[in-house]
């Protein structure tokens, strides 16, 4: 809505109107309506069929969710009345999908299964990794991997939240954006640990500070800056774009440099490079790519990153087990060697004491005889 306001405020109210002529279909017609930012009323042929939130400026209430409703055959007039006074998106951002009932249900089910698999698979990996770290007091790699998986699962869970219809205001978007920066913070820390010599230290520190700053910047923007300074929304978008370009190049270049220097960490570096590449592609294709069945570029690359880290964790765990087996075997050999050495020392001492006792017999006998004479 910013083009309608002199101060370029993205907040306001808008009306979308679409006229359709749908042929008779035994299967019926369904319309999938994605998130409408941030409150809306949906009318079909003048009849109100859905209402989410409150559009009034005075009593404004946000309610963002996905919706699915049927349309009649023949002439259809679709009206979507929207209002937004809180989010960096306004109105209809993602296109609705119209089709037969079976096609739309198949589409929605495939998408939900896809996101549920990504979410719960990574949560399972996180639980296993953190439990290993907690029970065995293992290395920091396990807890870092666990936090990474939890953050990715939170970041990927937004379709499930929107379809459940739970009204949590802007909190799901704060969680989605915040978890993204937690992932990048973990990646930055791991990159610094692996290739601190690839760049000057100031670059690593700048990347880490940028991630932490953006992590704090997200809730500050949603809860303070956007409501009281609407024009800041455009600045927020520019900051996000600069951040994505910088971090993607940082991860990719660092991975390429260190891969030639240390082949042992190739799995971790590959994960960094894949995720950095996904961030860059997502930025370059913004507004040009809309997933129909499955996910976005960063979501694919993020899952590949999790899989690469899974391989890294498995290799690390295998190496730890082999080291323990090696130490156990050599500990047994060491115990046997020490036992033989102690046995030999005891025998030598017995022989020494026997010789001393034998040498002392004659002087003792002479002393006893002398005492008897006295």
Listing of model-derived features with the role each one plays in the protein:
Residues 1-26:
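Extended carbohydrate-recognition surfaces in non-catalytic/accessory domains of CAZymes
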Residues 153-328:
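Interfacial "cap-and-anchor" motif at the non-cytosolic start of specific transmembrane alpha-helices
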């Amino acid at each position: 809505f910013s083009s309608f306001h002199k101060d370029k405020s993205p907040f306001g109210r808008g009306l979308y109107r679409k006229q359709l002529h749908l042929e008779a279909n035994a299967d019926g017609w369904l319309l999938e309506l994605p998130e409408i930012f941030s409150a809306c009323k949906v009318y079909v042929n003048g009849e109100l069929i859905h209402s989410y939130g409150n559009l009034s400026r005075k009593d404004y209430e946000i309610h963002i969710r996905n919706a699915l409703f049927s349309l009649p055959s023949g002439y259809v007039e679709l009206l979507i009345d929207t209002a937004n006074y809180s989010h960096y998106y306004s109105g209809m951002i993602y296109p609705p999908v119209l089709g037969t009932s079976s096609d739309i249900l198949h589409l929605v089910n495939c998408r939900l299964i896809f996101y549920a698999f990504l979410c719960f698979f990574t949560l399972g990996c996180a639980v296993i990794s953190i439990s290993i770290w907690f029970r065995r007091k293992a290395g920091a790699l396990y807890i870092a991997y666990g936090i990474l998986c939890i953050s990715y699962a939170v970041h990927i869970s937004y379709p499930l939240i929107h379809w459940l219809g739970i009204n949590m205001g802007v909190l799901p978007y704060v969680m989605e954006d915040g978890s993204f920066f937690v992932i990048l913070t973990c990646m930055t820390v791991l990159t610094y640990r692996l290739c601190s010599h690839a760049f000057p230290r100031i670059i690593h520190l700048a990347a880490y500070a940028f991630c932490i700053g953006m992590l704090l910047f997200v809730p500050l923007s949603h809860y303070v800056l956007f409501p009281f300074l609407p024009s800041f929304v455009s600045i927020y978008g520019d900051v996000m774009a600069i951040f994505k370009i910088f971090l993607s190049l940082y991860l990719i270049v660092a991975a390429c440099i260190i891969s030639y220097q240390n082949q042992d960490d190739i799995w971790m570096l590959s994960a960094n490079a894949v995720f950095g590449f996904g961030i860059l592609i997502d930025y370059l294709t913004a507004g040009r790519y809309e997933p129909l069945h499955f996910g976005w570029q960063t979501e694919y690359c993020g899952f590949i990153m999790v899989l690469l880290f899974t391989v890294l964790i498995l290799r690390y765990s295998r190496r730890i087990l082999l080291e323990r087996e090696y130490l156990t075997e050599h500990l047994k050999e060491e115990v046997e060697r020490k036992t033989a050495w102690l046995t030999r020392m005891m025998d030598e001492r017995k022989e020494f004491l026997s010789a001393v006792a034998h040498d002392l017999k004659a002087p003792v006998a002479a002393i006893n005889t002398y005492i008897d004479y006295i």
